[in-house]
Amino acid sequence: DLKSNRCKIEETGNRASSIVRGILLYSRGKDDEYIATDLCQLTKEYVWLSYHAVRANNKSFNVTIIEEYDNTLPLVKVIPQDFSRAVLNLMNNACYAVFSKSKGVAENPYSPTIKVRLAKDSDRVRLVIEDNGPGITKEVKEKLYTPFFTTKPVGEGTGLGLSITKSIIEQKHNGTIEMESEPNEFTRFTITIPIK
């Protein structure tokens, strides 16, 4: 019983530590400057950073990543560390989704796939990150951007990733973030930000 309580205290302490780290990372960026950035390069870098981070912790993790980058995109003024954090959060969630689905699918073939598309859309840039994981239920959709809401097991998620991502895109970059999902089929996040 003492050992069980110690484990619970340790898990709770680790989660609190992770939450505080997330808040500190987010609050640091108040006076960040907007820099003309190659979003193709930045996005690609953080897509693969996420993949390798997940792979380092789970040697059995494997996924096909299909990338489409519009190399004619002009440089776009963004806060690079914030935009990259948004990409990282969405990619981490996509990796988690396909990995958790692959662990639950034993008998029929499942090929974990994440699609990343970055393109010019009139006077905006559109970034789409789509996975073929378990999808998101209607109940979860309603709470998706709520701070501290997570569907991950204790110790694996803080519930800050999507709320921070929404804030980065909408408040700091005058953009939009939308999510479409079909249970057991796909989840697709679409970010648009103005080209300026």
Identify the residue ranges that each predicted region occupies.
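Core catalytic ATP-binding domain of two-component histidine kinases
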Residues: 1-196
